[in-house]
Amino acid sequence: MIDVSGKIRAWGRWLLVGAAATLPSLISLAGGAATASAFSRPGLPVEYLQVPSEAMGRSIKVQFQNGGNGSPAVYLLDGLRAQDDYNGWDINTSAFEWYYQSGLSVVMPVGGQSSFYSDWYSPACGKAGCTTYKWETFLTSELPKWLSANRSVKSTGSAVVGLSMAGSSALILAAYHPDQFIYAGSLSALMDSSQGIEPQLIGLAMGDAGGYKAADMWGPPNDPAWQRNDPILQAGKLVANNTHLWVYCGNGTPSELGGTNVPAEFLENFVHGSNLKFQDAYNGAGGHNAVFNLNADGTHSWEYWGAQLNAMKPDLQNTLMAVPRSG
């Protein structure tokens, strides 16, 4: 008699092995070629700040556009392959132009490749050497204090938005820092980062993107840090905080926006299921303060993330009570 269940399990193992082997290269291909130029047009009041970080032992470059004295901020976080010259939101979208005179200060930290914008256990050692990653401390303590003191930006009642790697980071930052971030946007994120083989896949992707090790970040897969940084497991915190959420993930099918390539299609389809699970967890915890866009066509590419950032602008302005500027 044929052991059908055994064959299914074997095929499942092979599929997982195949996914683990190909995921890093797919992420690399979907991310596109690096560029040294920014999108923002000349004339926009974009500043290039150097913000001191005691936690990281160096100054961090931050691209910044002021929304006015006392304005709330929108922190835009980059993907796994974040560069050290410009934030990906400026390289790949016209975010500064879209949000010009919106009443929202736009804050784009630069760098943090493979960081998950987290406080790492150990030095972040990769192909370029070792550095200190204490991004959560920087984003939730050092940077808001500096912006408040030096640019009159509100240190509370703000928003954090991220794509891919940083989508889950945005939710986690809002879960643990609810006074600062009353709004969190997650675009095409992996939402079950501590479950199954996800820690191994994340480690492989981080190794491909800079030679980093996931164990230096959150320890072995059974370490509590993995659960702390898992959006599905922290959905209840977001509900308890009444954080306003904007959660997007395409289904892996390209639309007229583009992003028609196998890596981008595969990756979006790969993370889509975890977004549905997050929605279930959020609803199951009694959540009622979220926008979920999970049914539309879309791939793992900037065309869709830019469209979402543009679409959420009125929602951000309303939630953060921004006062648009004129002139």
Swiss-Prot record:
Question: Which residues are the active-site ones?
Answer: 164, 268, 300
Q: Name one GO cellular component term.
A: extracellular region
Q: Which one Pfam family would you cite for this protein?
A: Esterase
**Region spans: Fibronectin-binding:** 96-106
Which keywords label this protein? Acyltransferase, Disulfide bond, Secreted, Signal, Transferase
**Residues noted as binding substrate in the record, renumbered to the chain:** 80-81, 164, 192, 270-273, 277, 300-302
Q: Where in the cell is it found?
A: Secreted
Recall the GO molecular function terms of this protein's record.
diacylglycerol O-acyltransferase activity; trehalose O-mycolyltransferase activity
Give the intrachain disulfide bonds: 125-130
Range of residues in the leader sequence: 1-38
Question: Which reactions fall under this protein's catalytic activity?
Answer: 2 alpha,alpha'-trehalose 6-mycolate = alpha,alpha'-trehalose 6,6'-bismycolate + alpha,alpha-trehalose; an acyl-CoA + a 1,2-diacyl-sn-glycerol = a triacyl-sn-glycerol + CoA
- EC number(s) on file: 2.3.1.122, 2.3.1.20
Gene3D superfamilies per UniProt: alpha/beta hydrolase
- Decide whether keyword Transcription is in the record: no
By its UniProt entry, which InterPro entries does this protein fall under?
A: AB_hydrolase_fold, Esterase-like, Mycobacterial_A85_antigen
The record describes the protein's role as: The antigen 85 proteins (FbpA, FbpB, FbpC) are responsible for the high affinity of mycobacteria for fibronectin, a large adhesive glycoprotein, which facilitates the attachment of M.tuberculosis to murine alveolar macrophages (AMs). They also help to maintain the integrity of the cell wall by catalyzing the transfer of mycolic acids to cell wall arabinogalactan and through the synthesis of alpha,alpha-trehalose dimycolate (TDM, cord factor).
PANTHER family linked to this entry: DIACYLGLYCEROL ACYLTRANSFERASE_MYCOLYLTRANSFERASE AG85A, ENTEROCHELIN ESTERASE-RELATED
**Which family is this protein grouped under?**
Belongs to the mycobacterial A85 antigen family.
Q: What is this protein called?
A: Diacylglycerol acyltransferase/mycolyltransferase Ag85B
Q: Which gene encodes it?
A: fbpB
